[in-house]
Amino acid sequence: MLVLTETSVGFVVFKLSSDAKIDNKDLWKEFETPEGANKALKVQAIQRFTSTASAVEDLTAVQDGRLTDSLSRFLLDTVGGADDGEKKKKKKKIEEMLVVSDPKLAGTINKALSIPVLSDSSTQDLYRGIRQQLASLLGGVDQKDLNTMSLGLGHSLSRFKLKFSTDKVDTMVIQAIALLDDLDKEINIYAMRVKEWYGWHFPEMAKIIVDNIAFARVVKAMGFRTNAVTTDFSLLLPEDLEATLKSAAELSMGTEISDSDMTHIHSLCDQVISISEYRTQLSEYLRNRMQAIAPNLTALVGELVGARLISHAGSLMNLAKHPASTVQILGAEKALFRALKTKHDTPKYGLIYHASLIGQAPQKLKGKMARMVATKAALSIRVDALSDADSRSDVSAAEVGISNRVKLESRLRALEHQAGIQSVRKVVSANGQQGRQQPRFEMSGVTGSYNAATDNVPLNGDLLPTQPATEEVKEEKDEKKDKKKKRKSEVAEAGDVTMDGDADLSMVAGETKEERRARKEAKKAAKAAKKAAEESGDGDKKSKKRRADEDEDSEKKKKKKKKDE
């Protein structure tokens, strides 16, 4: 049985003696001494590394489970077998089995060279003993020299792995964009605290200076508001704002604060200024990193949006594996699953919405623009992820992203022209200055007054709620009464209406009063006779029940008397 071992010297194949069996539980005892190790194993063949570069290349391939050309030739010469070109030819049967430490490499050797291999947990004690007595097994090699070679090869292998790590730059971008978001939150919190704190002393200043960083710099330079007249703000503010600030400081209605209060406010202003300066440096660092790792994506959607996409996907390679439809809604997963659950429309964009190409599109065309930008972004990401590092550092590295951006801008103008929509992009005048700028806030001091005349509600007929109803309503009621009387008189002229419980209404025409009275009396007599007959029958039933009840009561009374006696 042969044993393949990779060392810092090279690849070594040992011959395992017949006395030392690999399935023996006491195999480790054979390697307690150098003599026992040399008795159990003999060097069959050795292939030394020619240089450190070749050693790093071969060991990296072995760790990945790949078979290099040099190792393949060495095994064919030492063990035998057949390579891909000689598999069809007859070869002598290989009786020796090769022991390999890595199961993945063992499968590759068996498949490529048709060599029977063994790689399982039973070989661990064997390789542990080989590493322990390696210097004596190789013969003529000093242990110190072997340790030095192992250390140098380990350093070279580590540098090689770090150099070709595909995620190392991605990690820097992910951490940078996360820190940038945290700094924005911190600056906002500290700046709001400065405005609230200093607002007790100079409340009008918050409306005059809107920018947080400029506010902190002005507070740091001015101190108390009484120093505003003698302080030079030419390096911090324009002339009109400086004049407004000084005039407002003279008429301010803020309270007075102590020197210790101003000291703490100044220290907080220093924090705001220092964090903002570091944020500027971090933003420049992120821009340079994105230009180096993904120049085409940066040219298409910008460094911030590109960095957020990479951070959300985990790495540039993971982002390159996503289709354009996933890139389009990346970051809107919660809205997507909620829409699928409720069977509503799915979102049209996610993080890519903040790209300038989508932001300058009209609201009606944002969805279509997001789809086109995602398509071109997916192509740019794949170009950046799969291109060489040298080509990404070239001047023309962002050519794909720039050309796609130009195409998308022209396509957006064409869509706006077809839809008849005016462009919402920034208008630039002939002298290069931006048109339609937002006007600056000015404190006019004019307050609006309340118009009480708008509270009047006009009523019909100009009547107050307390006035009585009009004569038209009274006339309407009188007409209803007259109609009612008229209907009654018509009924009386036509004849009386008789009500019968068993029959419908009937009118007897030509009947005199005496006949009508006699008919009514006859009806009453018939009803009385019927009622008397019913009562007589019920009376007999009731009398029987009464007698039965009385008999029961008498019996109960007798029983009670007997018990009492």
Curated annotation (Swiss-Prot):
It is found in: Nucleus, Nucleolus. SUPFAM superfamilies: Nop domain. Residues 519-530 have a biased composition (Basic residues). PROSITE patterns: NOP (PS51358). One of its GO terms (biological process) is rRNA processing. Residues 471-481, 531-541 have a biased composition (Basic and acidic residues). Residues 293-417 form the Nop domain. Keywords: Nucleus, Ribonucleoprotein, Ribosome biogenesis, rRNA processing. Pfam families: Nop, NOP5NT. One of its GO terms (molecular function) is snoRNA binding. Residues 430-565 are annotated as: Disordered. GO terms for cellular component: box C/D methylation guide snoRNP complex; nucleolus; small-subunit processome. It comes from the Eukaryota. Its main location: nucleus. Required for pre-18S rRNA processing. May bind microtubules. Belongs to the NOP5/NOP56 family. This is Nucleolar protein 58. It comes from Cryptococcus neoformans var. neoformans serotype D (strain B-3501A) (Filobasidiella neoformans). The gene is NOP58.
